[in-house]
Amino acid sequence: MAWFSWQQAKQLDPSLNALDGFFASPPVKVQTVTGGLTNRCWRLESSEGLAYVWRPTSNVCKAFAISRHNEYQVLNAIAPLNLGPKPVFVHEQGLLVEWVPGETLTKPGIDIEELLPIAARIHEYPATAVPLVPFSYLSRIDHYWLELRCQYVGTEYEALYQKWRSEPSVTQVPAELCHFDLGCYNLVRGEEGVKVIDWEYAGLADPRLDLTLILQLADVPIELGVEQYCRIRGIEDVALWSEGVRAWMPRTQMMAMLWYLLAYKLWDDEQYLDSAREFKDLLCMEDHCFDNS
């Protein structure tokens, strides 16, 4: 993390000016936070020794359909869980949350037996307590595609987008709170156990969609992961959940493909394009090019 004076930081990121009314005196320590793919955040330490993270609203947020106000609503609603950072201040320029001390995990740092109970706690939280409009898979992927400005019209990317531009025809389950990015890089192990950060994509949706993303990120086989998850939640109809996860899998892969194409457009980093190609190839390699049930 790079260090800056408060004035230097505000020159680099004018959104920080929104905090002048929050801090009685300027933060004494200001650092950029590394690790996040979506946006550049700031770690701020007040003169009282309290640490915060400033999560700005930017063109990147708009490109990925991220709302800091929605993120604030989620964090405020789940405060009783003591699972995420405490939201402190929200402004049209960004969101200030408490800094979560501890070690950001890597894949070897957490196993599925510890990860899935965290997912279950999130999913089981009363959806009625979270004041959000339900997540729309179609709206999200259409937004990503429109942000790409016809750049991939006539390519395999468009063919896959069109092929998987529908919600799966499976038996519905009630919408629940989903994190949508529950990878090890968003888990911090500290004195109070493991906490979850970066709730910017969170929403109310089919929890099997979130479970699909979780198993995909953790590289866990579907049957194994679904069985363990259902055991944790006391769900008897495992087949219903396996069917849902399998149906969501190619759709989450296509959504990730579009996300990486958009990231490549925004940052011009070949690594993002490589990741998009990997998802494209994966969709065809698994015969999803020929099966859209």
Predicted ranges, named:
Residues 3-4, 155, 258-293:
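ATP/Mg2+ or Mg2+-diphosphate-binding catalytic cores
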Residues 34-46, 50-54, 165-209:
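Active-site acidic catalytic loop and adjacent metal/ATP-binding pocket
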Residues 82, 122-129, 168, 233, ...:
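A general structural signal marking secondary-structure boundaries and capping sites
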Residues 243, 247-250:
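Start-of-helix signal in alpha-solenoid helical-repeat scaffolds, especially tetratricopeptide repeats
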